[in-house]
């Protein structure tokens, strides 16, 4: 039975809205809805009905299913097939205003606080392109080694949905801002490492739609009502479309993670998946190994982390292989990743290609760029993740250390500044990845939120190197430097923690310890050499851990063996 929906729009909209909800609710009738002029906000709109979303049983783990080969060898079922995976990524840009109007584009505002006639689609309101959107598109295109279009245009992508007030989305169709690029990925060492290059088909500029908020449930199914928040409508996006060149969930997750690092290094987006600043739709099909023809494509949505993406792909690979082994047909559809049950569920059928009836946007001129503009933008690009990893490797760091340090642009910048102070590479890396990272995690701060400066950490490491303090003392001082700031030398002096390095003072200390522990001295000289640690411990206790360990051991051994 058809399900009805109504939508009340506010902000003085004096027109009727004709729409069809395209969610997984079966065949819905068209409904003409009068809008409420002058209402203070967009209000209750969607009455809930039973969802047709199908929860399917978890597939048999096909990767452990085997069959006998003619030679007597066994072959897992999954060895017969390969996945073909492509990703469409929407990157929400961090511009201060929206793509085609002056409304703020900030995340987390009160619903419908950042709206105007343009992003609400009111009659007569005309868009004006935000130049920062074009700049971001060119930066990302150049970072991807793509071809930048000297002349591109915007198009109207037409479809009806409650969160799309204009009835179309301003996007780019046949002439995008950038085409034919690639991303280089270093796979994690724990998964065997290796280098991969994945093609990027295109990058195009577009605007985001609004957002449906489902009361009583975060999904339409089971919600008591739904409301529309248009704060996100008109927020600028860059859509990055990959070539279908990934074959595993790990490769797909690492591709997406590298793209996230790239947009963060460029400073064009925070890439936060939990906030929706980076949304990935995965297209996956299965085919027998050796076959060129693609299988039936299934789209997966609702993955808000890279681990969820990897698990969703692996589940879907198992599900599709199991269907093929049973002789069943794979349906072309959109499926949702459900975190709770750790499986994909059917959302809606996608038989055939959607007809969005693209045509050129008549209210916006072509985007015309000069070669000089492109060259200047290229010259001002920051060092990108892949180049930074290669540089760190050239400094002698392991691939594991390189991946950790270059993963976060802020951590990498901090590390580079510490090195500029003359700190030895491995020492700087060990402190940042070890004690600094551990304390930041315990107090839930990022490296940019902490009071510790690169100069202060470099100074702390220098104090260890010149013998002013021991590593133990440095670790005691570090939390204060992270939480309160200040110089390492100042903290050492104010607490009286300078290392005791005067040979005469250390010799006097050792003489007293040996005099107080005559039996242990005799036992040591009788062959129990492990007692050396006992004497060192006594010296550390007497000095509060401040005695220079190198000098201590030298003087102690001379006294014990003399």
Curated annotation (Swiss-Prot):
Catalytic activity: L-glutamyl-tRNA(Gln) + L-glutamine + ATP + H2O = L-glutaminyl-tRNA(Gln) + L-glutamate + ADP + phosphate + H(+)
InterPro entries, per database record: Asn/Gln-tRNA_amidoTrfase_suB/E, Asn/Gln-tRNA_Trfase_suB/E_cat, Asn/Gln_amidotransferase, Asn/Gln_tRNA_amidoTrase-B-like, GatB, GatB_C_1, GatB_Yqey_C_2, Gln-tRNA_amidoTrfase_suB_CS
This enzyme's EC code(s): 6.3.5.-
Region (Disordered): 48-76
Gene Ontology MF term list: ATP binding; glutaminyl-tRNA synthase (glutamine-hydrolyzing) activity
Location in the cell: Mitochondrion; Plastid, Chloroplast
GO cellular component: chloroplast; glutamyl-tRNA(Gln) amidotransferase complex; mitochondrion
Keywords carried by this UniProt record: ATP-binding, Chloroplast, Ligase, Mitochondrion, Nucleotide-binding, Plastid, Protein biosynthesis
Pfam families tied to this protein: GatB_N, GatB_Yqey
Broadest EC class assigned to this enzyme: ligase
Gene Ontology BP terms: glutaminyl-tRNAGln biosynthesis via transamidation; mitochondrial translation
Compositional bias ranges of the Polar residues kind: 64-76
Extra remark beyond the main annotation: This protein may be expected to contain an N-terminal transit peptide but none has been predicted.
Subunit-structure text: Subunit of the heterotrimeric GatCAB amidotransferase (AdT) complex, composed of A, B and C subunits.
Role of this protein: Allows the formation of correctly charged Gln-tRNA(Gln) through the transamidation of misacylated Glu-tRNA(Gln) in chloroplasts and mitochondria. The reaction takes place in the presence of glutamine and ATP through an activated gamma-phospho-Glu-tRNA(Gln).
Protein family per UniProt: Belongs to the GatB/GatE family. GatB subfamily.
HAMAP family: GatB
Protein name: Glutamyl-tRNA(Gln) amidotransferase subunit B, chloroplastic/mitochondrial
Native organism taxonomy: Eukaryota, Viridiplantae, Streptophyta, Embryophyta, Bryophyta
Gene, per the UniProt record: GATB
């Amino acid at each position: 039975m058809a399900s009805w929906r109504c939508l009340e729009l506010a902000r003085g909209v004096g027109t009727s809205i004709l729409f069809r909800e395209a969610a997984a609710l079966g065949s819905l009738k068209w409904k003409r809805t009068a809008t409420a002029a002058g209402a203070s906000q967009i209000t209750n709109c969607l009455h809930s009905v039973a969802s047709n979303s199908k929860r399917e049983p978890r597939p048999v783990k096909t990767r452990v299913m085997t069959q006998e080969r003619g030679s007597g060898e066994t072959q897992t079922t999954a060895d017969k097939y390969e996945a073909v995976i492509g990703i469409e990524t929407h990157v929400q840009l961090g511009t201060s205003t929206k793509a085609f109007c002056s409304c703020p584009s900030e995340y987390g505002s009160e619903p419908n606080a950042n709206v105007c006639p343009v992003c609400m689609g009111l009659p007569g309101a005309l868009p004006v392109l935000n130049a920062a959107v074009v700049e971001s598109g060119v930066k990302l295109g150049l970072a991807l080694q793509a071809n930048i279009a000297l002349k591109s245009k915007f198009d109207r992508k037409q479809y009806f949905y409650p969160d799309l007030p204009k009835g179309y989305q301003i996007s780019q169709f046949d002439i995008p801002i950038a085409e034919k690029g690639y991303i280089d990925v270093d796979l994690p060492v724990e998964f065997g490492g290796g280098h991969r290059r994945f093609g990027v088909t295109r990058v195009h500029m577009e605007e985001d739609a609004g957002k449906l908020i489902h009361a009583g449930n975060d999904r339409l199914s089971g919600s008591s009502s739904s409301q529309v928040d248009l704060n996100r409508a008109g927020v600028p996006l860059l859509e990055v479309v990959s070539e279908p060149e990934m074959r595993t969930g790990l490769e797909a997750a690492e591709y997406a993670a590298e793209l996230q690092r790239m947009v963060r290094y460029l400073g064009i987006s925070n890439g936060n998946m939990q906030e929706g600043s980076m949304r990935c739709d995965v297209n996956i099909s299965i085919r027998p190994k050796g076959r060129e023809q693609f299988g039936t494509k299934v789209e997966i949505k609702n993955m808000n982390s890279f681990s969820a993406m990897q698990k969703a792909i692996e589940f879907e690979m198992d599900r599709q292989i199991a269907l093929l082994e049973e002789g069943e047909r794979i349906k072309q559809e959109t499926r949702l990743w459900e975190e709770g049950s750790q499986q994909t569920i059917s959302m809606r059928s996608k038989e055939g290609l959607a007809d969005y009836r693209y045509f050129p946007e008549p209210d916006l001129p072509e985007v015309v760029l000069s070669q000089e503009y492109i060259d200047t933008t290229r010259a001002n690009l920051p060092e990108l993740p892949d180049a930074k990893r290669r540089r760190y490797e050239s400094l002698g760091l392991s691939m594991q250390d390189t991946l950790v340090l270059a993963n976060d642009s802020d951590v990498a910048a901090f590390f580079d500044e510490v090195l500029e102070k003359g700190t030895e590479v491995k020492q700087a890396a060990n402190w940042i990845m070890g004690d600094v990272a551990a304390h930041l995690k315990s107090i839930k701060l990022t490296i940019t939120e902490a009071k510790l400066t690169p100069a202060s950490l470099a100074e702390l490491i220098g104090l260890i190197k010149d013998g002013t303090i021991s590593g133990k003392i440095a670790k005691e001082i570090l939390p204060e430097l992270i939480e309160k700031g200040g110089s390492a030398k100042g903290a050492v002096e104010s607490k009286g923690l300078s290392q005791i390095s005067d040979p005469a003072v250390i010799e006097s200390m050792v003489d007293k310890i040996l005099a107080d522990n005559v039996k242990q001295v005799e036992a040591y000289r009788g062959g129990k050499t492990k007692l050396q640690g006992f004497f060192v411990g006594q010296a550390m206790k007497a000095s509060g851990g401040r005695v220079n360990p190198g000098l201590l051991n030298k003087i102690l051994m001379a006294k014990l063996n003399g």
